[in-house]
Amino acid sequence: MSKIFVNPSAIRAGLADLEMAEETVDLVNKNIEDNQAHLQGEPIEVDALPEDMSKLQISERRPAQFTDNTGGKEEGSDEDFYMAESEDPYIPLQSYLEGVGIQLVRQMKTGERFFKIWSQAVEEIISYVTVHFPMPLGKSTEDKSTQTPEEKFKPSPQQAVTKKESQSSKIKTISQESSGPPALEWSTTNDEENASVEAEIAHQIAESFSKKYKFPSRSSGIFLFNFEQLKMNLDDIVKEAKKIPGVVRLAQDGFRLPLRCILGGVGSVNSKKFQLLVNSDKLGKIMQDDLNRYLAY
């Protein structure tokens, strides 16, 4: 009877995927609870308000149309204020997000990349919200009863020059904003993109956490080293890996990362054992060759 051996790295990678999926589901549920916090509060009792406040009437009519018959419509307004549970738009949204979270967990169990799965889920959620929660048309909130007629006046020559300068500065600002941030800094300004990049780097490192890579030694030979021997947390390894040129760009595109180059770069800075064993001159050449080979794809 043959025995089935399971690679420990595969188990660690699966556990890391499940943890990320659970954190994603918890984050979605927390956002739903925060968005529904206003629905969980207790209504204000009118009898508990001061005596002057109970006489106020809230309506969209003009001040000239206010009358003293406030008692006839209080009962109907209370019924209209509260929304029935079947009409609450957040209930189907919560069910939809829970379904998305379950689907994410299933896809990650099959071995699909987190960056690809999360990008598709974000697009689906945006399309769902766009369809079911359309933006209301802009309404004029100006109160004509409180406005005063505008007085026309001619600006002085000095004011005209100042106005032209301010307009030109606004035009320059708008043109700079429309051109977008520089290409080298766009990834640092987008928190969601950074989270996806870090998740992709962590996923690939976790898959090969115990795999040993060959490095040149000081004794003109080679030695084997892996990420476990760094004795570092995965989050710290990811932070150091992002400092290596080209790694962030490869993770954004969902390509394979030069893990030996990452291990060499992190080990040469954070591991004394690695520093004592490695030939630093040959290490730099190997890291550069790995980067060039992976970036060529």
UniProtKB/Swiss-Prot annotation:
Keywords: Chaperone, Host cytoplasm, Host nucleus, Host-virus interaction, Inhibition of host innate immune response by virus, Inhibition of host interferon signaling pathway by virus, Inhibition of host STAT1 by virus, Inhibition of host STAT2 by virus, Interferon antiviral system evasion, Phosphoprotein, Viral immunoevasion, Viral RNA replication, Virion. Phosphorylated by host PKC and by an unknown kinase. A motif (Nuclear export signal) lies at residues 49-58. InterPro entries: PP_M1-like, PP_M1_C, RABV_P-like_C. A motif (Nuclear localization signal) lies at residues 211-214. One of its GO terms (molecular function) is RNA-directed RNA polymerase activity. GO terms for cellular component: host cell cytoplasm; host cell nucleus; virion component. Residues 140-154 have a biased composition (Basic and acidic residues). CDD domains: RABV_P-protein-C_like. GO terms for biological process: symbiont-mediated suppression of host innate immune response; symbiont-mediated suppression of host JAK-STAT cascade via inhibition of STAT1 activity; symbiont-mediated suppression of host JAK-STAT cascade via inhibition of STAT2 activity; symbiont-mediated suppression of host type I interferon-mediated signaling pathway; viral transcription. Residues 168-179 have a biased composition (Polar residues). The modification Phosphoserine is found at residues 210, 271. Residues 140-191 are annotated as: Disordered. The keyword Phosphoprotein applies. Belongs to the lyssavirus protein P family. Non catalytic polymerase cofactor and regulatory protein that plays a role in viral transcription and replication. Stabilizes the RNA polymerase L to the N-RNA template and binds the soluble protein N, preventing it from encapsidating non-genomic RNA. Also inhibits host IFN-alpha and IFN-beta signaling by binding and retaining phosphorylated STAT1 in the cytoplasm or by inhibiting the DNA binding of STAT1 in the nucleus. Homotrimer when phosphorylated. This trimer is stabilized by binding to the L protein. Binds soluble protein N, and ribonucleocapsid. Interacts with host STAT1, STAT2, DYNLL1, DYNLL2 and PML. This is Phosphoprotein. It comes from European bat lyssavirus 2 (strain Human/Scotland/RV1333/2002).
